[in-house]
Amino acid sequence: MHFLLHCWLAILIFCSLDYYFLQETLQHYPENVINPIFLSSDLIVKLKNQVWDNGNAIFQPTSFQISNISSGTGAKNVVPGHLDMLFNFRFSTESTESSLRKEFESIVDSLDFDYEIEWNLSGLPYLTTENTLKDIVVNSIKKEAGIDADKNAKGGTSDGRFIAKMKTEIIELGPLNKTIHQIDECVSIADLELLKNIYLDVLKELN
């Protein structure tokens, strides 16, 4: 069993982007067509190649991902008049919500699109600098599992971002996530039993 111990976490910005071009146009009149799907390809290439930051010793570089793109009415012979894009940033402490928004909008503006953006910040990156809880957890993992924990800032968004506002030490330790968000997501019963023993030892050491 391989343990990943999350002592830090990068948080996501979720966002939707709507492009507005002309009204829907019949493809029979190509001279009147402005296709938002074609035009958005330039933006997608720019966003894919953009380096938002280089990360640091703890955090990976900020990553940008597009999760959904939709356009059109479903008609086979009508060019759509707008395009919707859903995307997110998983950002490190090297960037801020403000800097990413400014940089993103600058890229969109450079392509002369009419657009609307709706931003949604799920939380801010946090960093655990104290070692009391971390050392206890690492020692408990060594005692119960016989392995050295891999301490890193990888992983998804968690409720730890809310507790971090209390300026307390945050450690994330849970089951393996090889099947996370997949069909038939599952964990090993043996892993859960081992995890229970680790939690119990941590509680004893904290008492």
Where are the predicted features?
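Metal-dependent amide/peptide-bond hydrolase catalytic core
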Residues: 3-7, 11, 17-207
